[in-house]
């Protein structure tokens, strides 16, 4: 089943996108900072969410990991 139609898979993809963008921005900030608008601006926005809401994103990742490992 596609991640678009399964809510848990969609949340997993969004969390992975946020975490990956925040990690890439911590390694090479200029890579994401030059595209703040347009289609590629989504990655910059995900990186900002990952930086500013870091504790909440971490808790969501842990909860998602436990739900995938133990509830399926």
From Swiss-Prot:
One GO term of the biological process aspect: constitutive secretory pathway
Alphabetic keyword roster: Glycoprotein, Golgi apparatus, Membrane, Signal, Transmembrane, Transmembrane helix
Extracellular side, ranges: 27-53
Positions of glycan attachment: 35
Subcellular location, record wording: Golgi apparatus membrane
Keyword Transferase: no
GO terms for cellular component: Golgi membrane
Ranges annotated as spanning the membrane: 54-71
InterPro entries: KISH_domain, Ksh1
Signal sequence, start to end: 1-26
Cytoplasmic side: 72
Membrane topology: Single-pass type I membrane protein
Function in brief: Involved in the early part of the secretory pathway.
Family recorded in the similarity comment: Belongs to the KISH family.
Protein name (database record): Protein kish-A
Organism from which the protein derives: Taeniopygia guttata
Gene this protein is translated from: TMEM167A
